[in-house]
Amino acid sequence: MAFTTPLTAHGYSYQAAYIKAHIAHCDAQRTVVKLTVWPTQADRENGAEPVRYDNDLRQYQTDLNLQADNPVAYAYTLVQASGEFIDATWNV
């Protein structure tokens, strides 16, 4: 599970950055999601190192009523619902 989106990170622009999300912290009040970015999906699949992305943490209010199959799906649902990545292609 991942998404692609145009992204600028550390002075470089990526047309279809490949981004994976996972929960870094979660409690009853907040959920912190860490994003890991590669230039492309092919780079990720070929074992390339992630790009430097200093803006990699997102904090959201924990929604105990939000339905998700697992913690990873919950993280992606929060990121998608935030509206930050409006040009993203989800579930790649």
Regions found by a protein language model. Give the residues of each.
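Viral virion structural and adsorption modules
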Residues: 1-92
